[in-house]
From Swiss-Prot:
<dbReference type="InterPro" id="IPR004412">
    <property type="entry name" value="GatA"/>
</dbReference>
<protein>
    <recommendedName>
        <fullName>Glutamyl-tRNA(Gln) amidotransferase subunit A</fullName>
        <ecNumber>6.3.5.7</ecNumber>
    </recommendedName>
</protein>
<comment type="subunit">
    <text>Heterotrimer of A, B and C subunits.</text>
</comment>
<dbReference type="GO" id="GO:0005524">
    <property type="term" value="F:ATP binding"/>
</dbReference>
<dbReference type="InterPro" id="IPR023631">
    <property type="entry name" value="Amidase_dom"/>
</dbReference>
<comment type="similarity">
    <text>Belongs to the amidase family. GatA subfamily.</text>
</comment>
<dbReference type="InterPro" id="IPR000120">
    <property type="entry name" value="Amidase"/>
</dbReference>
<dbReference type="InterPro" id="IPR020556">
    <property type="entry name" value="Amidase_CS"/>
</dbReference>
<keyword id="KW-0436">Ligase</keyword>
<dbReference type="InterPro" id="IPR036928">
    <property type="entry name" value="AS_sf"/>
</dbReference>
<feature type="active site" description="Charge relay system">
    <location>
        <position position="75"/>
    </location>
</feature>
<keyword id="KW-0067">ATP-binding</keyword>
<keyword id="KW-0648">Protein biosynthesis</keyword>
<dbReference type="Pfam" id="PF01425">
    <property type="entry name" value="Amidase"/>
</dbReference>
<feature type="active site" description="Charge relay system">
    <location>
        <position position="150"/>
    </location>
</feature>
<feature type="active site" description="Acyl-ester intermediate">
    <location>
        <position position="174"/>
    </location>
</feature>
<dbReference type="GO" id="GO:0030956">
    <property type="term" value="C:glutamyl-tRNA(Gln) amidotransferase complex"/>
</dbReference>
Length: 482
């Protein structure tokens, strides 16, 4: 496989007989080995060869497969039958999944071949992919810096050319932020648009599977495959849609609202990229204005006061009795204590403790219940803003990739990395990070992203916008040097 070809190009090559699924798989594996030092993947799919052969057989039998032979990487919290699903944790170091997540199953049904599982922050709790039990993932643009998180491995797999597309999960920005820091597209669909069945839960009311890609066409291609109602997920929406890219003409008259609260505290490179993107939109005939969403001031606090309690509940099942690596301790209580002490990393333990505290008697109303009220206010303010504008825009992250270890010992600084993304999850909206430029830091060019937000169930509007931005030259997509 020629690194950095798009999924659409590879699928067409297989469909025309120019190449085979097996050849694409071998190319992806060779590329994964070449960039092994980035630590993007935590495991390879031992069944990939037979899956590639099966795709070839289906093609020969006359099946039309939109992702024919396309190699793909999925985050290590998305279950795939017969592969380890560790969630970046010692707790699940040897867990082999007996079933496949709906999103991954749909990819395989469309002809994709799952190459392996991508590294991640432990249980998706982080913004840097430093807390994984498999070690940190490195940013391909500067190996001394983080790729973002928690889906850092999925972002790096696409940015470094292992696979043209990948799947991650986004609870508070975990697809969009690493996409921005690695210079690729990252899309968070409307909550419920993609089934969560088979996704290991972090915060169930916020989690959403989403794709990474190097082209707008590939985003649309993946969403046409993975979106749709799933009776196995009670939060899944029955809202059929056809995803397609738009042309430059679609920007004429588009109402774009810049969220005023996102304009402070950004680095010069982020400000420049946002400004250039807005100039391109104006030049193509879009109407650009500003809109205020005052309650965003409380988004980070509300997000963590909701996510942490949900995490404390979801992770209660890992006690070594049914789930998790059991540590013997004499009696059951001691064994459970040791299992959780040794199985969970520091950040996961911190969030479980804070979440349990926020739900405890006497504090529930003061913290969790109040955060839920703020969540409702934020959602209402977004609805009001969409009465004036078709899409809203912010930086994806206020800064480019930071150095490894720079924020690891300062939880509040790490949490602030999600300042532009968490509100979208609180409101359940779709959002897209577009690679929008670069900022030079210490002699290295680091990618930055711009985030576009649409009303609920208007996901296709964002993918059409991505294609239009490509058409007017507003997307800055480059390949990092090995």
């Amino acid at each position: 496989m020629a690194a950095f070809q798009t999924a659409a190009q590879l699928a067409r090559a297989v469909q025309s007989g120019e190449t085979t699924p097996q050849q694409l798989l071998h190319g992806a594996l060779a590329r994964a080995e070449a960039v092994r030092g980035l630590n993007a993947l935590v495991s390879l799919n031992s069944h990939a060869e037979e899956q590639a052969a099966a795709v070839q057989g289906r093609m020969q039998a006359g099946e039309t497969l939109p992702l024919a032979g396309v190699p793909i990487v999925v985050k290590d919290n998305i279950n795939v039958t017969g592969t380890r699903t560790t969630c970046g944790s010692r707790m699940l170091a040897n867990y082999v999944s007996p079933y496949t997540a709906t999103a991954a199953q749909k990819l395989q049904g469309a002809g994709a071949v799952i190459v392996g599982k991508a590294n991640m922050d432990e249980f998706a709790m982080g913004s840097s992919t430093e807390s994984s039990a498999s070690g940190p993932t490195l940013n391909p643009w500067d190996h001394e810096r983080v790729p973002g998180g928690s889906s850092g491995g999925s972002a790096v797999a696409v940015a470094a050319g292992i696979s043209p597309v990948s799947l991650g999960s986004d609870t508070g920005g975990s697809v969009r932020q690493p996409a921005a820091l690695c210079g690729v597209y990252g899309f968070k669909p409307t909550y419920g648009r993609v089934s969560r069945y088979g996704l290991v839960a972090y915060a169930s009311s916020l989690d959403q599977i989403g794709p990474f890609a190097r082209s707008a066409e590939d985003l649309a291609l993946l969403m046409n495959v993975i979106a749709g109602h799933d009776p196995r997920d009670a939060t899944s929406l029955d809202a059929p849609a056809r995803f397609a890219v738009g042309g430059a003409d679609s920007l004429r008259g588009l109402r774009v609202g810049v969220i005023r609260e996102s304009l402070g505290g950004n680095t010069p490179g982020v400000e420049a990229a946002l400004g250039a993107t807005l100039d391109a939109l104006r030049g193509a005939g879009a109407v650009v204005g500003e809109v205020s969403i005052p309650e965003l001031e409380y988004a980070i606090a509300a997000y963590y006061l909701i996510a942490m309690p949900e995490a404390s509940s979801n992770l209660a099942r890992y006690d070594g009795m049914v789930y998790g690596e059991r540590v013997p301790g004499g009696d059951v209580t001691r064994s459970m204590t040791l299992t959780r002490e040794q199985g969970f990393g520091q950040e996961v333990q911190r969030r479980i403790l804070l979440g349990t505290y926020a739900l405890s008697s006497g504090y529930y109303d003061a913290y969790y219940a109040k955060a839920m009220k703020v969540r409702r206010l934020i959602a209402d303010e977004f609805t009001t803003a969409f009465g004036q504008y078709d899409v809203l825009v912010t930086p994806t992250s206020p800064f480019p990739a930071f150095r490894r270890g720079e924020k690891a010992s300062d939880p509040l600084a790490m949490y602030a990395a999600d300042v532009d993304t968490v509100a979208v999850n609180l409101a359940g909206l779709p959002a897209l990070s577009v690679p929008a430029g670069f900022e030079e830091v210490d002699g290295k060019r680091l990618p930055v992203g711009v985030q576009f937000i649409a009303p609920a169930l208007q996901d296709e509007r964002l993918l059409a916008l991505a294609g239009a931005l490509e058409a007017v030259g507003a997307v800055q997509l480059e390949m990092p040097q090995d």
